[in-house]
Amino acid sequence: MKNVGDLMQRLQKMMPAHIKPAFKTGEELLAWQKEQGAIRSAALERENRAMKMQRTFNRSGIRPLHQNCSFENYRVECEGQMNALSKARQYVEEFDGNIASFIFSGKPGTGKNHLAAAICNELLLRGKSVLIITVADIMSAMKDTFRNSGTSEEQLLNDLSNVDLLVIDEIGVQTESKYEKVIINQIVDRRSSSKRPTGMLTNSNMEEMTKLLGERVMDRMRLGNSLWVIFNWDSYRSRVTGKEY
């Protein structure tokens, strides 16, 4: 500190009289250096988080349209949306050690995918493994295992069962084949048995979901403090045009 103070005094003597020094004491200089160090450290942390997210996006199934989805940029225009946002935030905060799953149901374009992606993006930042995948993609991957793809059906089921959070999109859009029902049943059963939650996105109501997936799957989806959030407001897509959407 003495050396810094001596340096400041020498510099002040060398400066022209009309120039005012930014720092008058060694303490002020050190405080500024500490502040700048904290700013650089925060910037570096943000860059590292961004790089980590970029690396994981290719493995998470989060599509480019939803890679920037967050709780902060979720549009709230009614009480129902506020409730959905609050539930999603709470789900993330209580994720560790929680078996609770979630189902987001409602009409297309109401923000189900946005909030599901926001949950996954936040969990990625917290070091969790996540995967968002449609039923159609699951079934396509399953069919590939029959064509000597190098991955067996068992390996694929294990991969789907071992991520910290699996979100299955477009439940109810599929052809309702018996094989699809069996596969989804196996996935949910394995995940619940290993205390790993599952998310589902659907346009169907509870009665339709129960008919489609069966009571056993729906029972698994109710374990713990599981969520069923109904997105029953107007579609965003019907109110936007051009580049806004």
Curated annotation (Swiss-Prot):
Write the record's keywords in alphabetical order, separated by commas. Answer: ATP-binding, DNA replication, DNA-binding, Hydrolase, Nucleotide-binding, Primosome
Q: How does it assemble?
A: The helix loader is a DnaB(6):DnaC(6) complex with a crack opening large enough to allow ssDNA into the central cavity. Can occasionally be detected as a component of the replication restart primosome, which is composed of PriA, PriB, PriC, DnaB and DnaT.
* EC numbers: 3.6.4.-
The observed outcome of changing Y179A is: Loss of DnaC ATPase activity, decreased ssDNA binding, decreased DnaB loading on ssDNA
Result after altering S177D:
Loss of DnaC ATPase activity, decreased ssDNA binding, decreased DnaB loading on ssDNA
Picking any one GO biological process from the record gives:
replication fork processing
Q: Give GO MF terms, alphabetically.
A: ATP binding; ATP hydrolysis activity; DNA binding
Q: Which InterPro entries match?
A: AAA+_ATPase, DNAC/IstB-like, IstB_ATP-bd, P-loop_NTPase
On induction, the UniProt comment says: Induced by hydroxyurea.
Q: Please explain the role this protein plays, according to its UniProt record.
A: Required to load the replicative helix DnaB onto single-stranded (ss)DNA, to initiate chromosomal replication. Also loads the DnaB in the replication restart primosome (composed of PriA, PriB, PriC, DnaB and DnaT; DnaG primase associates transiently with this complex). DnaC alters the inter-domain and inter-subunit interactions of DnaB, inducing an open ring conformation that allows ssDNA to access the interior of the DnaB(6):DnaC(6) ring. Has ATPase activity only in the presence of DnaB and ssDNA.
Mind telling me which residue stretches traverse the membrane in this protein?
A: none
Protein's name in the database: Replicative helicase loader DnaC
Q: Which reaction does it catalyse?
A: ATP + H2O = ADP + phosphate + H(+)
Site description Probably involved in interaction with DnaB protein, residues in chain: C69
Q: Which domain of life is it from?
A: Bacteria
Q: What organism is listed for this UniProt entry? A: Escherichia coli (strain K12)
